[in-house]
Amino acid sequence: MILDELDRSILRLLQSNALITIKDISAAINLSMSPIHDRIKRLEQEGVIQKYVTLLDRKQLDLGLVVHCQVTLDKQTRNNFSEFEQTIAKFPEIISCSLVSGSFDYYLKLVTKDVETYNKFYQEKLAVLPMVAHINSLFVMDEIKTTTELPL
């Protein structure tokens, strides 16, 4: 799908505030409400806009620890990849999982209450997976930049 500058302007506004009204978008980009509504519907139907979410303050929800894990599987087979991905998709602590190139296979981002809670997750859920050969855990000391907004 080819996006023009109006589409990109609408997307920038929606990324910064998913609850922004069509009226406010109209005022911001100087376009009437009807074509804005039509463009948003088209962007949704084409899958450019996948869903609308609410970002939560994890610290206020007692999820103060962010951990990045580099996971290496014992064998790089299609079955191992599939089984690992299906299993970790069920763990709510894991908020991001990427299959990567390089010296490990997966890069995970997870949130937990504290180190003790992470240790329990590590020992009881992650390290016991039969296809996992190695896990390197990196504890976030400070988040310098965290955003879901894509550069448009």
Language-model features: locations:
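A compositional/biophysical signature of low hydrophobicity enriched in polar/charged and small residues
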Residues: M1-L152
